[in-house]
Amino acid sequence: MPLELVQGDIAHQPVDAVVTAANKQLMGGGGVDGVIHRAAGPRLLQAIRPIGGTPTGTAVITPAFDLERQGVKYVIHAVGPIWRGGQHGEAELLAGAYRESLRLGVENGCRSVAFPSISTGVYGYPLDRAAPIALATIQDFLRSHPDLSVRMVLYGADALHVFERALAQL
């Protein structure tokens, strides 16, 4: 299945690359990023330090380190926007973070990528507004990359239902 919605732990997915919702400094944090950094181990932070950061709406890729034991090859660090009311280019920046993550995955030979819901935690992006952007961006990318499979890994049943409704409306 090219696009799948699941409820679960993003750090335990059978995929080639796991996307983390990073901050611009790429230095690890709470939420999904903290989970991925803990699962990948301290070498992830050592690998990301020299990069120094990346702008909102972009992504960078590193080895998966300790996640490689589960078959994950890469961690893709996507920087989504902080929600500021929706009139500051947030939708374009969010789509860019998804698109750049997918591009990096394909460029590095990944056949499967797992995403969290980027920017909907501490960055405050409303889930019902983020879901259609995420799913439309992913589906658009998959049209030109049919061999790629994408798994949206959502934390909690409420988030899963929001994404299921958004997918049904696309």
Swiss-Prot record:
UniProt xrefs under InterPro entries: Macro_dom, Macro_dom-like
Macro domain location: 1-170
Pfam families: Macro
PROSITE patterns (alphabetical): MACRO
Highest taxon of source: Bacteria
Family indicated by similarity: Belongs to the MacroD-type family.
Protein name: Macro domain-containing protein DR_2288
Natural source organism: Deinococcus radiodurans (strain ATCC 13939 / DSM 20539 / JCM 16871 / CCUG 27074 / LMG 4051 / NBRC 15346 / NCIMB 9279 / VKM B-1422 / R1)
